[in-house]
């Protein structure tokens, strides 16, 4: 909660600096939280911790826990897990507090597919594929960040012989996933597979325009898929009333 001279923007660089913290505030605070990393290594965490200790070290002795936020790419091949463990142990022992690390995208890095079917192909300055998937409903980060999701057998526009704009079947102007090129022409009924979708797809899904939620399947090591859950009209209705 921000008031007075404190910014209400949680991403503001001047949200709270150490000189703005009232001396009696710590009586009401059980822990501190920072979230400064995004797809970063343990060396960046080490740099952040040094800054936190320099600015807020005195308060760390008075609180019960420290949340180091997310953005730790723990499962990345070159991630220094030993350094992460060393830093967590050091903070715990130095300040006698509990340490939390948010799971973040690392737990599902490079995992998950969003399968979509080409419903129609229209021409409007560029050939456009109308999909049964939607950026607004199923991949909102595409519009919010913005972000260009990886597509199996898809390349940058004009890189390959056939370039298309990938759109959806909602009424939202701008519900466009992006422009991709392919080695071969795409036809109505073709399946396309967006990759690295386990992170921010299901947790952000919505039923805008009555667009259905995608079914969730689990693929085993042999490539066999089993249905975990399917969604229908009743799920849409119950979210509204």
PLM region descriptions:
Residues 1-10:
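Single conserved hydrophobic/aromatic residue that forms the stacking wall/gate
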